[in-house]
Each structure stands twice: as C-alpha cells, then as structure tokens.
Amino acid sequence: MNKFIVLTVSLAALAVTGASWAGGHGGNPAVKARKAHMQLYAYNLGKLGGMAKGEVEYNAEAAETAANNLATLTTVSQAGYWAPGTSNAELGEETRALPGLWGADSTAMQIGGEMGEAITQLASVAGDGQEALGAALGGVGKACGACHKAYRQPAN
C-alpha cells in the first residue's frame, strides 16, 4: 500500500510539474498536457502488453504496479486537457484530436467510462498471472481503440 501512495503522489507531482513546464515551452498547454497523460498511459500499457504477449517475462508485482498506475491516471481530472478550440481543425499538426470529440453527439465520455471500468478490472487481476492479465488487457485496448478510431486522426 505504501508503494501505491508513493506512486500516486509521484504521478500527481509529475502531472503538475509537466503541466507547468509545458506552459512555458511553446505549443498549446492543453495539448501538451493531454499528450503527456497519454504517454503515461502508453508507457504502462506497453509494460503490460509485453508481459501479456510473452515478449517480457511476466512479473506479478510489476504488472500490479503498472495496472495501478493506470488506475491512478484515470482519477486525474482531464477537464483542462480537452479545451474547446484544441482540435486539429484549429491547431493543425500540433494535435491529432478530431473536432467531433467536442460535438454534441460525442461518445467520448461514455468511452472514457468504459475505459475506467476496464482498467479497474485489469488492476484487480494484473497480479493473477499472464493469462488473466491478457484477458483483462483486451477490454482496455478495446476502449482505447474505440476512442482513437472515432476521435483521433490516423497517423500519416
């Protein structure tokens, strides 16, 4: 539990420091903050994906830590990251976020809720072995992919 508290405090400090730093280094601060948040997701998902695929030796403690990191990230308010006027229609190549994300018919909040539920499930089984990890990771990937497919411009 102490590791989780230290990790939570560290992630919060990193987010605040990163957002403060981003504000003074060119580009839109909201876009920089959301990219940093997504990089933290990607880093932890990469560790878990490697274990689930057998590319990296499964380690229960490392899997639990990465899954708990993801769970902690879902508790950080992203409201300021997704400010209106920060899509690729307004900011061009600075972001791949499509304008539909802010549309009245956007399902992004629903997908985000599904992702949170999938991450909670993942965190509850990450230490239970490679097979359990892989099965739970699929739900997270499905939610991430749904949002990216609908609201992120494909890479060139």
Residue ranges and their predicted role:
Residues M1-T8:
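Bacterial N-terminal signal peptides that target proteins for export
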